[in-house]
Curated annotation (Swiss-Prot):
Pycsar (pyrimidine cyclase system for antiphage resistance) provides immunity against bacteriophage. The pyrimidine cyclase (PycC) synthesizes cyclic nucleotides in response to infection; these serve as specific second messenger signals. The signals activate the adjacent effector, leading to bacterial cell death and abortive phage infection. A clade B Pycsar system. Keywords: Antiviral defense, Cytoplasm, Hydrolase, Nucleotide-binding. One of its GO terms (molecular function) is nucleotide binding. This is Pycsar effector protein BcPycTIR. It comes from Burkholderia cepacia (Pseudomonas cepacia). The lineage of its organism: Bacteria, Pseudomonadati, Pseudomonadota, Betaproteobacteria, Burkholderiales. The gene is pycTIR. Activated by cyclic UMP (cUMP) and to a lesser extent by cCMP.
Length: 303
């Protein structure tokens, strides 16, 4: 089977197969780059490509065959062509593998490294949103999401390190409201050293997630730099959106700066803001805080 997809002669089939991958989302440009860089690997039935608690962080796209996902020696799911495996460790390189992945049949996979994924993500930022959607579905599969109703609304604030000033301003303006505002760096995540387990714990606790796009964040789109949320901000907002729903996952974006969002973020609740660190900071930011406050109070806690 691997011969069919190998070399220049097999490139058309590689591109076709990769275009159909969930993380690729039909993007032929992304599929073509993947076809050039990915390593094709033939896997025999019973062979293991990922070992639970392993420290590798490659990402695998399933081209043919099927793979069992095994946690603590118990098979829990089966993945098929179009699926990918290894996303969690690829997104958080210091995290150990959370499951074993073994071939249920003779299979073919395309492997890329974490570094290659990061490089692709800088050119095709939609891949982070798609990955977040897939991981959200897998979190739902675990069926651990029944929470007791909270007495106090909890609002979790996502941002890049560069936008922490905006996050802290929002927290201070909500100091006397009947809800708790928690920026990501205050006892939730450690800077540049958190895992998806940390995110999942916060998913279970919060009623709203507010992601702050910052004008200093940029991405390169067709050779032009555009303001855009950082990859981790888009990724985390996608996870919270998958759990909480679009009304409870809110994006705050700088007013008038033409922020570029992944195309499949359409429909996310957005609130524009003005942040002037030097002049009338609270007065200029106030309308955005008021709009967000009204939105939060209208929905309340999750039942």
């Amino acid at each position: 089977m691997i011969e069919r997809f190998s070399g220049e002669a097999g490139k058309r089939l590689r591109v076709e197969a990769l275009t159909g991958q969930k993380l690729v989302g039909g993007d032929k440009g992304l599929a073509a780059e993947l076809a050039d860089m990915a390593e094709l690997i033939s896997v025999k039935a019973g062979d293991v490509i990922i070992q639970q608690d392993g420290t590798d962080n490659d990402l695998y796209f399933i081209i043919t065959g099927a793979f069992d996902i095994v946690v603590n020696a118990t098979p829990i799911r089966r993945r098929f062509p179009g699926d990918s495996v290894g996303e969690m460790a690829a997104v958080e390189p210091v995290q150990k593998r959370s499951a074993t992945v073994s071939a249920a049949a003779d299979s073919l996979v395309a492997k890329i490294t974490e570094q290659q994924l990061s490089e692709l993500g800088s050119r095709y930022p939609d891949i982070w949103r798609r990955m977040a959607k897939e991981l959200s579905k897998r979190l739902i599969e675990r069926n651990q999401f029944v929470n007791a109703k909270r007495e106090k609304i909890r609002v979790f604030v996502i941002s890049s390190a560069e936008a922490l000033g905006v996050a802290h301003l929002l927290q201070s303006m909500f100091a006397h409201d009947k809800f708790l505002t928690v920026p990501w760096n205050q006892g939730v995540f450690k800077v540049a050293n958190y895992t998806l387990d940390d995110i999942e714990r916060e998913l279970d606790q919060c009623d709203f997630a507010v992601a702050i796009a910052h004008g200093d964040d940029v991405t390169n789109a067709r050779g032009t730099e555009w303001p855009a949320p950082r990859d981790n901000v888009v990724f985390e907002l996608g996870l919270f959106m998958g759990r909480l729903g679009r009304k409870r996952a809110i994006l705050m974006e700088p007013r008038g700066e033409g922020v570029k969002l992944p195309s499949d973020m359409a429909g996310v609740t957005t609130i524009p803001y003005v942040y002037d660190e030097k002049n009338d900071t609270e007065a200029k930011f106030g309308p955005a805080a008021t709009a967000l406050r009204k939105h939060i109070m209208s929905l309340g806690t999750i039942s």
